[in-house]
Design a protein with these regions (language model features):
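Fold-independent oxyanion-binding glycine-rich loops
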Residues: 4, 24-27, 51, 74, ...
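Conserved P-loop NTPase nucleotide-binding/switch module
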Residues: 65-67, 71-124, 129
Length: 143
């Protein structure tokens, strides 16, 4: 999530212009903020809202910070789902993570299932751990 955030925020030379990003970091796992200062490099156009419920943080960001992209990890509650739908209706893009061993596992959560079935997401990336530090990455376009 940190690398994705930094690349969206800074941009990628000749490929992607940097965008205004707000990270909703409910438990400080992405930014590792200490006394309000990010300890991880999340990019030059990144603001962080931490120590607040994700759904509330998303709405605060949209109303007062003009993000082009919201980033949050471990989504899955009804409040998260409603906030994500609100963000998309406001034209804000998002990068979100959810835990599960497979798409079928993630779809057991009714809120995530609803977001996927409603085609709120353009793309789903599944990262499966394979023996130690090896990973298998599967990408699925939704729309």
């Amino acid at each position: 999530m940190r690398d994705i955030t930094r690349n969206i925020s800074n941009g990628i030379l000749n490929k992607l212009q940097g965008l205004n990003v707000v990270v909703i970091d409910e438990r400080g796992e992405i930014s590792s903020s200490y006394r309000g200062v990010m300890q991880n490099d999340l990019g030059i156009r990144t603001d962080v809202i931490n120590d607040i419920q994700k759904s509330i943080g998303m709405k605060i960001a949209i109303r007062s910070m003009a993000p082009q992209v919201l980033i949050a990890d471990e989504i899955g509650s009804e409040d998260d789902s409603e906030a994500i739908k609100y963000a998309m209706c406001c034209g804000v893009k998002g990068v979100f993570s959810a835990h599960g061993n497979s798409l079928e596992d993630v779809m057991k959560n009714p809120e995530l299932k609803g977001l996927i079935q409603d085609k709120i997401f353009e793309k789903i990336i599944i990262i499966k751990s394979r023996h130690g530090s090896n990973y298998e990455i599967e990408t699925m376009n939704i729309n």
